[in-house]
């Protein structure tokens, strides 16, 4: 139906234009025929002026009608068969692309995880929305602010993405404050990140002498080592370590430099906004504190009550942790150990820095006046399964910084505390650093910095729970969290990770126990079609095995008596 409507629209416009041309032709004849008589007749002259004004108006209308006709033709022309209807790239974008263009865009999307086809066609100096609070105003220029080194980390990033990041930094950072931009290439293989990138660097430096530098790793060393390389190469008072897939917003640097000038021990995170991976639209994110869960995945925390009490939207936000982007006093960051070079690839390194900063004399803040737009990826081509490196790095953080609370990390990943089967590397130098800096305990951190991090006390065992009657199925939370638990084929992922505390069981052997309440036991019974379901029933002697234990349980006299009573 829609194509026929567009055809009707075009025909109607053509008819209107033809009619207007006929009227214009008639008026021109009228003008020619009466040109002599109008000289002697002022009234006739005024009438003709009115007619000619209308003629000019008709001329303008014709132009607009022709434009509409052209747009309608273009609209009809832009309808193409969608080759990749299931691709995330084409859910909101790309319906006007020809089929060969769709193929190019889709292949680039699979390679990079974002829309390189569009990025290559956007201006490098595009304008993005100023997302700061209206209450923020730029104070008079402070020439005494510290200087800034900006480090951009990349590995096989799209060239146009890197160039747009560089351009935004140059255009939106005062030149007297921006000392250098350091690119760190973690062993990229893309050809355009070699000669072509070098040519662009040369071009930038022709306009801004010596501003850009590049460091190239001779092997893949990972995100953390790339950041350390950038820090080592920096020479300004303050260093900003950023991803290369960002665009800084207006006046992003001055509030950070001013805050670090006030307190060199504060490590700053700007507020992230989101650049959508498909259409590159900017989505404004709310200001939030940075936190983490016990698996050390990053998350946003609500703003603390004391921040609201200030009634100042521009005030720094006290934050338990930090995301990947950070700005710090270069020397102070070195004094507390920069980053943990033993981290692999991705994940956990930001949480480690947050813990170390707080426990060793520094602090983390989010600064609402500083905004950076961060390009999201639909997928990470370089690491399809992020959990492998995050899990390994999380254990490393737990062993160095979390003291008696480390079991919570092992519980979150469903790993035994003893012999987890994962090599998290040598941590002796990091433990020595902690001792040298006289750092506070993790208990202090929980109580004074991150009380929202929920601790499960008195845990004696955790993991999957199997009934001795049928050991290939486990207790599962069910299809929806909070739903009625079910028995399901064992897979050991989070819906099946249980935990038990000192008084929630009856010990019968090191790992076999009853679960009971009011003299009834949690057991399984065979259901229809040879499946099993959970029931509370009179104890029949079934036992449960739980995967990992933290300590000896020991029998209690009271529980012995209750269980013996339940058997009669």
Task: Explain the meaning of each model-derived region.
Residues 445-568:
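Lectin-like carbohydrate-binding module/patch detector with strong preference for beta-trefoil
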């Amino acid at each position: 139906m829609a194509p026929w409507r567009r055809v009707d629209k075009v025909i109607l416009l053509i008819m209107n234009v033809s009619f207007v041309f006929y009227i214009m032709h008639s008026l021109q004849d009228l003008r020619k025929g009466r040109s002599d008589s109008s000289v002697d007749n002022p009234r006739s002259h005024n009438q003709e002026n009115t007619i000619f004004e209308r003629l000019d108006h008709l001329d303008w209308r014709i132009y607009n009608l022709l434009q509409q006709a052209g747009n309608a033709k273009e609209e009809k022309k832009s309808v193409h068969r969608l080759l990749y209807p299931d691709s995330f790239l084409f859910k909101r974008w790309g319906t006007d692309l020809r089929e060969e263009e769709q193929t190019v865009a889709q292949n680039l999307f699979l390679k990079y995880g974002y829309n390189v086809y569009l990025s290559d066609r956007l201006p490098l100096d595009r304008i993005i929305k100023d997302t700061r609070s209206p209450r923020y105003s730029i104070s008079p220029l402070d020439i005494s602010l510290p200087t800034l080194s900006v480090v951009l980390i990349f590995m096989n990033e799209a060239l146009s993405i890197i160039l747009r990041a560089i351009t935004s930094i140059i255009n939106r950072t005062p030149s007297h404050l921006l000392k250098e931009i350091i690119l760190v290439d973690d062993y990229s293989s893309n050809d355009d990140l070699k000669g072509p990138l070098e040519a662009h660097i040369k071009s930038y430096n022709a306009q801004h002498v010596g501003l850009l530098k590049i460091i190239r790793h001779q092997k893949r060393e990972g995100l953390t080592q790339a950041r350390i390389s950038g820090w080592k190469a920096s020479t300004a008072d303050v260093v900003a370590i950023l991803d290369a897939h960002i665009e800084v917003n207006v006046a992003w640097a001055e509030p950070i430099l001013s805050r670090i000038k006030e307190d060199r021990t504060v490590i700053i995170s700007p507020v992230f906004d989101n650049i959508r991976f498909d259409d590159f639209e900017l989505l404004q994110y709310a200001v939030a504190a940075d936190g983490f869960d016990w698996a050390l995945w990053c998350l946003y925390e609500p703003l603390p009550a004391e921040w609201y009490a200030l009634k100042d939207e521009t005030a720094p936000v006290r934050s338990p942790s930090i995301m990947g982007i950070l700005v710090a006093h270069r020397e102070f960051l070195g004094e507390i150990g920069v980053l943990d070079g033993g981290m692999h690839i991705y994940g956990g390194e930001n949480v480690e820095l947050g813990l170390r900063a707080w426990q060793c004399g520094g602090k983390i803040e989010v600064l609402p006046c500083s905004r950076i737009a961060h390009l999201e990826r639909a997928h990470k081509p370089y690491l399809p399964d992020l959990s492998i490196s995050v899990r390994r790095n999380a254990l490393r953080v737990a062993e160095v910084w979390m003291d008696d609370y480390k079991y919570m990390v092992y519980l979150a990943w469903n790993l035994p505390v003893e012999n987890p089967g994962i090599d998290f590397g040598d941590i002796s130098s990091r433990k020595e650093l902690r001792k040298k800096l006289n750092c506070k305990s993790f208990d202090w951190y929980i109580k004074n910095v991150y009380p929202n991090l929920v601790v499960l006390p008195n845990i004696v065992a955790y993991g999957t729970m199997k009934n001795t009657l049928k050991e290939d199925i486990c207790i599962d939370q069910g299809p929806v969290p909070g739903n009625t638990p079910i028995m399901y084929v064992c897979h050991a992922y989070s819906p099946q990770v249980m935990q038990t505390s000192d008084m929630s069981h009856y010990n019968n052997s090191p790992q076999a126990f009853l679960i009971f309440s009011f003299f009834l036991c949690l057991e399984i019974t065979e259901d229809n079609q040879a499946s099993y379901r959970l029931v509370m029933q009179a104890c029949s002697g079934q036992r449960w095995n739980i995967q990992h234990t933290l300590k000896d349980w020991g029998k209690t006299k009271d529980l012995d008596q209750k269980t013996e009573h339940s058997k009669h």
